[in-house]
């Protein structure tokens, strides 16, 4: 079974269910039904943010939002070979966990 991977934008969010609707501008602004986000963390992407979505190829609308890819508009706040960083807020650096291989930083 082949999957269909698309790039779209979050059009609305059901915060209680952890699901979102995604709009595909290249498909005449077609909007999905509510689909889940692939995550066991609760951090919903902002409405209007770009996301990758996998749809099953069985002819249904079944799919899952994989997450937000890095892009020219959504760049990593910092980088490094052994860096782990998890931003907890919508604005990078406001609240985060950071580990660079030797130092653990927790900012809140």
Task: Set out the residue ranges of the language-model regions.
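Extracellular beta-strand solenoids
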Residues: 99, 106-108
